[in-house]
Amino acid sequence: NWMVTRINATLETKQPRQYFIGVLDIAGFEIFDFNSFEQLCINFTNEKLQQFLNHHMFVLEQEEYKKEGIEWTFIDLGMDLQACIDLIEKPMGIMSILEEECMFPKATDMTFKAKLYDNHLGKSNNFQKPRNIKGKPEAHFALIHYAGTVDYNILGWLQKNKDPLNETVVALYQKSSLKLLSNLFANYAGADAPVEKGKGKAKKGSSFQTVSALHRENLNKLMTNLRSTHPHFVRCIIPNETKSPGVIDNPLVMHQLRCNGVLEGIRICRKGFPNRILYGDFRQRYRILNPAAIPEGQFIDSRKGAEKLLSSLDIDHNQYKFGHTKVFFKAGLLGLLEEMRDERLSRIITRIQAQSRGVLSRMEYKKLLERRDSLLIIQWNIRAFMGVKNWPWMKLYFKIKPLLKSAETEKEMATMKEEFARVKEALEKSEARRKELEEKTVSLLQEKNDLQLQVQAEQDNLADAEERCDQLIKNKIQLEAKVKEMNERLEDEEEMNAELTAKKRKLEDECSELKRDIDDLELTLAKVEKEKHATENKVKNLTEEMAGLDEIIAKLTKKKKALQEAHQQALDDLQAEEDKVNTLTKAKVKLEQQVDDLEGSLEQEKKVRMDLERAKRKLEGDLKLTQESIMDLENDKQQLDERLKKKDFELNALNARIEDEQALGSQLQKKLKELQARIEELEEELEAERTARAKVEKLRSDLSRELEEISERLEEAGGATSVQIEMNKKREAEFQ
């Protein structure tokens, strides 16, 4: 984990990111003969990712059918992996018990196994006791994963979960002469390193974080990122286990397809509608297949247009369904529509090319005909002239003709010149008028085309605005439903929060009561210890006093030789029992009196001995009772300490859960506010669209009036330039 943190810190660019493309490459389920802690982490990750894939590909796919109003019978694929995931990650699950065991210094792998069996064996269907087979590694428990049953060996799990760094090795690296190595460990703070004031708690808490906790935290972050993206899934299939080229192991491939959920995906694709397109996009892209199905010049709703277009095509009408906002296709139909569209485009382009080539060829042929006619006329005239050029009468005609009617010819020439001048002037005026009318006609036609384009654009804008309006209304309905759902979820979360708060208060009260009981027991224990110390002091004092009495008795025994043996036996008995005596105050007084009266008689000595033995037995019984009560109190204290630790652990878990619930509640409230703001924005946009639509309608009516006026002006100007207009119409027809 330390190495992963260092690598991430080195690769981090600290630049703002808004969009990203991520590639997640992970090994699949690992089922070996010997499976340890690493395999559990990898298989747990695969369980989460497989659940995400199943939810995204199967559950969300069928939920979209229901949301869009498609008639669909829900297919339960039976691939809910939540039971196995809860067994691993939930409180009192495998990882939770492993983290709890890492806190206790006397915990071992076997105590971890015992707790697993106590909590889950026979209570969870996914947790089983393995059968150890001779010749294979020992297994301590088995889990039923999505890909199969995996036997796990738990030896060394506690040490792996703690993942400690050796302090001595780290200190050696920090003092290394290699600059890179010393920089890597420069910021590492070990257990013996000085901690700044106010930061010690955070350092200590973070250093105790286990590998399983970090793995779960990173996995939760990964799943959050995946849920915020549009994922695409790629499955890798191993063809054979021998790595041989061109060899496919059919059972192995089918097993992988079944484990990966590919077979279920194929079932959904065959029965469902994997391809979908918005109505507007479908109408715009596939209208070319049958333009007559959607008439020009009138507004038709996108859904109705798509329905008319699909009903007019020669396809299987059971292969598609209409939703609220999209049209859904079965697998293969969209590819067929694409082929039909490509074929239609190919025919249209071929026809355009043929017409263009025909027009060019006809123009070239017309030029050839005109050239041929001109050449024939010129040749005929030249041949006729050459035939009469040398005829005598023609020569005479050429000589006499200029002399005849010369005066009349001159008058005619003058008249013709005047007429030519008038005609030329009239022609120039007519040409000028014609050019003026042509320019005016061209400008009017240009205005007409511009107005038609503008009207068409406004009609398209109006159609788009109506589509957007319908879409906004649908979005508003969906958002209102989401807001209602969020409100219900928020109420449920508030109720859960209130219940958790009540539980927390109850646990706090129990904890305070337990603390008071512990305080009382500690006070009682302190009192008992004080009494014990006082008793020991009394015993010591009595021992010293009895030593003095021994000296006195020794002096008296010289005078009482007859009683020496009995007296010495009594002293030996007292010396043997002096370590166990606690309270001998009464015995001391009686003993002093008996010592003073010892010279009296032997009977008094025997009486003293009997009293001492009775007091000794009483003190031994009291001492034994006191020791037993002390042991009971210590056991009670240890049990209360264990209960207190357990309650503290549960309280911390509840506090963390309450904080998560509060954070989720705040996020839901924030999202609710964002949705309300979005609804207000959509309502404002809807109002703006309505205003723009009214303006477009008004502009459309104004343009229609202007177009009618222009048409009237064109009709008025058409009387003077009817011939020119006909020519212009012919030109327009040719260009069209």
From Swiss-Prot:
Residues 403-736 form a coiled coil. GO terms for molecular function: actin filament binding; ATP binding; calmodulin binding; microfilament motor activity. Residues 219-241 are annotated as: Actin-binding. One of its GO terms (biological process) is sarcomere organization. The keyword Nucleotide-binding applies. InterPro entries: Kinesin_motor_dom_sf, Myosin_head_motor_dom-like, Myosin_tail, P-loop_NTPase. Myosins are actin-based motor molecules with ATPase activity essential for muscle contraction. Forms regular bipolar thick filaments that, together with actin thin filaments, constitute the fundamental contractile unit of skeletal and cardiac muscle. Muscle myosin is a hexameric protein that consists of 2 heavy chain subunits (MHC), 2 alkali light chain subunits (MLC) and 2 regulatory light chain subunits (MLC-2). Interacts with ECPAS. Interacts (via C-terminus) with LRRC39. This is Myosin-7. It comes from Oryctolagus cuniculus (Rabbit). The gene is MYH7.
